A protein has these predicted regions:
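Conserved beta-strand segments of alpha/beta enzyme cores
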Residues: 26-28, 56-58, 148
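Mid-to-C-terminal catalytic subdomains of enzymes
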Residues: 110, 115-120, 148, 152-225
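ATP-dependent adenylation/pyrophosphate-handling site
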Residues: 2-6, 10-47, 139
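Short beta-alpha connecting loops at secondary-structure transitions
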Residues: 29-32, 70, 74-79, 144-154, ...
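A conserved beta-strand->alpha-helix junction
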Residues: 42-78, 85-98, 102-113, 125, ...
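Generic structural signal for well-ordered, non-membrane alpha-helical segments
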Residues: 12, 38, 42, 76, ...
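Core structural elements
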Residues: 10-18, 64, 110-117
Length: 225
């Protein structure tokens, strides 16, 4: 069995689709909802991966736990580390529960792409890349946790990932979704995260994305491409 942390972004969605085509129900998609996603995104992710793909989908509602951990935290890098560390806590708890049910998981798939590795100055660049920022999916496993790692996109760039997603039959609203950081809206908020700031940002982001989608549709019609 293979476990995958599904964020709903392009990268993890393409890996999920790829694994689903190969192993079906042997894939366990764990969607950790930290409450920092875009407006209506959790519902959209669940709909796609419960109706279109025959996988084991687990929705973890961790909004309250993340809110407590991020309370009063203002530094962006500190937010990234907190969100990444708690992700592993949530993820490992699910993996443990699965193992206790007699269905242990050996492999873990990740949506790591080559720019993630470059920005983090990580191992596959041969140590030649300087660290630009940390990525929550490149933080080492917690002590005592081990999976055989599967990273099918680790030599792909974003445009190549999108092309693969289209070929695998993912819907356009997933494949062409605007880039979004793994730690979510927390690092787009200056200062501490609060429910009020999150609500304002979710609504503002939804308006901007709606306008961009409308513009792109008009451009597509005008050029006839």
């Amino acid at each position: 069995r293979v476990i995958l942390g599904l964020s709903g972004g392009v990268d993890s969605s393409v890996v999920a689709a790829l694994c689903a085509k190969a192993i079906g129900k042997q894939l366990v998609c764990v969607f950790v909802n930290h409450g920092l996603l875009r407006k209506n995104e959790p519902e959209e992710v669940e709909e796609v991966f419960t109706k279109q793909f025959d996988v084991d989908f687990i929705h973890v509602h961790a909004e309250d736990r993340y809110a407590k951990l991020l309370d009063g935290v203002t530094d962006p890098e500190a937010k990234r580390k907190i969100i990444g560390t708690q992700f592993w806590e949530e993820f490992f708890t699910v993996a443990q529960d699965i193992a206790e049910d007699g269905k242990p998981v050996q492999f873990m798939a990740q949506g790591t792409i080559y720019p993630d590795i470059i920005e983090s100055g990580a191992r596959k660049t041969g140590g030649k890349a300087s660290t630009i920022k940390s990525h929550h999916n490149l933080i080492p496993f917690p002590e005592g946790v081990h999976f055989d790692l599967i990273e099918p996109l680790d030599h792909f760039f974003k445009d190549e990932v999108r092309a693969l997603g289209t070929a695998l039959g993912l819907p356009a609203h997933i494949v062409h979704r605007q880039p979004f950081p793994g730690p979510g809206l927390a690092i787009r908020i200056i200062g501490a995260v609060s429910p009020e700031k999150l609500e304002i940002l979710k609504n503002a982001d939804a308006i901007v994305r709606e306008e961009l989608d409308a513009y792109n549709e008009r451009l597509f019609q005008e050029t006839g491409e």
